[in-house]
Amino acid sequence: MASEVLALLDLKGTERVLDVGCGNGKTTAEIAARLPQGSVVGVDASADMIAFAVNHEAVHPNLQFAVADARELLYQDEFDLVVSFNALHWIPQQDLALRSIHRVLKRDSLAQLRLVPKGERKSLEDVLEETRLCPRWAGYFRSFRDPYLHLTPEQYGILAERNGFKVAATRVAAKSWDFQSQSAFLAFGSVTFVEWTRHLPQGERLAFATDVLDRYRQVACDAPGEENFFRFYQIDVTLSRR
């Protein structure tokens, strides 16, 4: 995945780059290695992720990491490029995130964003929402708000234009991962479902995840042997700051 997203970047080596939702910092460090006369800042809302990145990936003098909310970035007209890879779909208040990204970019600079859009196929997040509303689980989620963004590529483009960007390019692809076993798929779920499972007692979390994946197989399994396939759409959007 890292090689895919890095291939999207046309770097001269002198840019100042911001990586929004940098996670463990690995991709951010690879960007830093391509900027011999530039620099990159990786930000993430998770203090734990930033601590990991600082301890494991801060190996370049032109690389910094900081805890920051994508909706409230504390920069102004500073970056030549903003990138974000599979992070922004976890921010339902996307207007705020896009406005924030627009503010930190220099005029006529670019944002290269990769996220998971809504598509024709029912998503894993759609199934999570259906599952938590069923009678067995609904009582645990009375105050719950869906943490996921559900926009089609077309809707995302309109949203970006509304927040001061011009859509320079959009690419959509259907992706699939084969986890090959239920245990591996459940391990993935234990991380991916955390915004839902944190509302459950510890003893119910495995049952909830199993219920979700059983329901998901009904919409994602197209043929025998595909019981542990995760299918999703990926959108790469290039935005120009006006």
What is each residue range found by the language model?
Residues 1-15, 30:
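Conserved alpha-helix/loop element of class I SAM-dependent methyltransferases that forms part
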Residues 16-20, 24-72:
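Class I SAM-dependent methyltransferase SAM/SAH-binding core
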Residues 24-26, 144-242:
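Conserved Class I S-adenosyl-L-methionine
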Residues 71-82:
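A short acidic, Gly/Pro-enriched loop at the edge of an enzyme's catalytic core
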Residues 110-137:
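Conserved class I S-adenosyl-L-methionine
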Residues 6, 29-32, 98-102, 129:
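A structural alpha-helix within SAM-dependent methyltransferase catalytic domains
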Residues 81-94, 117:
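A short SAM/SAH-binding and catalytic strip from SAM-dependent methyltransferases
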Residues 95-110:
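A short glycine-rich, Lys/Arg-flanked "PGG" loop and its adjoining helix->strand segment in the class I
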